[in-house]
């Protein structure tokens, strides 16, 4: 199994039977009123032509615009309508309909215990069904006794861990590698008029909780290697750079070196 990072939460997973593009998002297609984009730019650092020529499956974890890059996907399906969309068993059909609207024709729907593509096993976990915009999912890929769990922004619930503990031993492997974000994109509490000391305490608590979440998942699933994806974010507007993490200031964002160091054993 080979895994290539394409920026933000994007990954290209290659197995002996399939090649899966996960959450592709290009710097040239900013999201959220053009305020949020991949940095540094990933158009030149990633061989997109190779990926688009070879991809067999597409996995988009959820509908947020930093994961569902509509402009890119329209172009992909216009050239490769044969690419099969891995579709989690969502409560709502919004994601499937959005794919249909932009030209997707082939779907791989979640089976009772996952799906097999040749000898590669694929399993999705639906993690949130609070409302239509917050349905999220994770993808487990098992190939030749190697496994990769792409968690991205989602959560691993007790029933997901139970499934992994029950069925993974039959594949003669554990969770060899996971990809998961460890920062989040919240502007709270910086967007509130708190006293500076209170604001710093809340920022520190937020950062600690995101790190604890990452480490808890890693420890509970006994993950051997891990990749931090989708962040940490950074604000580039000059009048707002004080909201980034510098030393001991009040910021909800992690310093990039801090995130690297907390999981440095897996480098």
Task: Specify the residue positions occupied by each region the protein language model found.
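A short helix->loop->beta-strand "cap" motif at the edges of active sites that frequently abuts
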Residues: 18, 79-84, 104, 222-225, ...
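Cap/insert and terminal regions of metallo-dependent hydrolase folds
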Residues: 86, 159-263
């Amino acid at each position: 199994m080979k895994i290539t990072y394409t920026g933000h939460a994007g990954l290209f997973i290659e197995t002996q039977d399939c090649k899966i593009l996960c959450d592709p998002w290009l710097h040239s297609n900013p999201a959220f009123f053009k305020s949020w984009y991949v940095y540094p730019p990933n158009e030149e650092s990633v061989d997109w032509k190779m990926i688009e020529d070879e991809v067999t499956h597409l996995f988009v974890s959820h509908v947020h615009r930093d994961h569902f890059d509509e402009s890119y996907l329209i172009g992909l399906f216009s050239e490769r309508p044969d690419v099969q969309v891995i579709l989690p068993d969502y409560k709502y059909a919004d994601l499937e309909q959005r794919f249909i609207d932009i030209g997707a024709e082939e779907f791989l729907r979640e089976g009772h215990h996952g799906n097999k593509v040749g000898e590669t096993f694929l399993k999705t976990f639906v993690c949130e069904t609070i409302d239509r915009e917050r349905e999220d999912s994770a993808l487990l890929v098992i190939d030749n006794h190697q496994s990769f769990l792409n968690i991205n922004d989602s959560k691993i619930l007790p029933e997901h861990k139970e499934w992994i503990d029950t069925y993974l031993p039959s594949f003669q492997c554990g969770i060899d590698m996971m990809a998961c974000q460890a920062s989040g994109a919240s502007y709270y509490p910086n967007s509130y008029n708190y006293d500076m000391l209170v604001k710093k305490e809340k920022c520190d608590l937020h950062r600690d909780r995101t790190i604890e979440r990452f480490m808890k998942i890693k420890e509970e699933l006994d993950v051997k290697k891990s990749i931090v994806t989708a962040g940490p974010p950074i604000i580039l507007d000059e009048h707002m750079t004080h909201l980034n993490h510098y030393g001991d200031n009040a910021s909800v964002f992690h310093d990039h070196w801090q995130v690297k160091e907390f999981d440095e054993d897996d480098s």
